[in-house]
Amino acid sequence: MRILIYGAGVIGSLYAVLFAETGYDTSIYARGKRLEFLKKNGLLYKKNQNIRRAEATILGELSDNDAYDFILLTVRENQLYEALAELKNNKSNIIVTMVNSLDSYKKWEDIVGKGRILPAFPGAGGSINNDGILDAALTPRMIQPTTFAEISGNKSEKTKQFSKILRHAHIPYQKVVDMHMWQFCHLAMVVPIADAYYEADCPERAGKDWKIMKKTAKKLKRNFSFLRKQAGRLSPCKMNIFRFLPLPIMTIMLAVTFESSFGDKFMYQHARKASDEMRELHKQFYAYMKKLKEARYEIL
């Protein structure tokens, strides 16, 4: 099994480590300073307070003739189309897009070819410290496993094989029917959370700001109530908790989560490092919400 990780940030590096540990033939494609570090030191990561080096091949360029069983595209939303263009002529058949985006999957297929895209989203978080060492982890299964689906919503040989490699790598996963709806609901949650950090005077201690926590709770209730009304369902179903929890309880839960080690690793670190991406996703998400609202009024 040959796997290419396109993108050597936190998410790409962690999946490369996990696949390499499993024994898969794993390569990771990097650029710039990250490439320089990896070429010199290898893919270093922290595990049980020890520093280890993953048995992964470091690539600074790609050949169209290099065929992989799976390519995992782990880049930011604003890097997506450049990456797809570079992979357009690659011989590999399956590109797993682990990207925050509300774009139509057809636009992606128009670039790389129909049937090659497997939309997905990672269940992981963490950071790469100033020494270039990965300190990351998978999110607990009950919170957010690696999620994916065929564009059609049907099961396929692609989803079967991807499930198999995730299972062998001990990576929690779930298959859904409508990946676009899942990503829309995901953004309904993470956009207000990121906004809270950006609005706080001290982002690292945003959970201490009761006013911001209450505002964030209101945004979450509003987002999910609107989506439920528009789509008739939420994905996954557990997102309905944001609709039903009383505002005071949700505010307290948010404050506790923001101040926890979980909040630091899986929420704060990403919001801090990907502020440009999250601000752009904020614009896209609320523009999409406005579009849905206007379409509903036209029907009425």
Regions found by a protein language model. Give the residues of each.
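Flavin-binding catalytic cores
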Residues: K164, I212-C237
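Active-site-proximal catalytic alpha-helix in oxidoreductases
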Residues: H180-G207, K211-F224
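NAD(P)-dependent Rossmann-like dehydrogenase/reductase catalytic/cofactor-binding core
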Residues: R228-L300
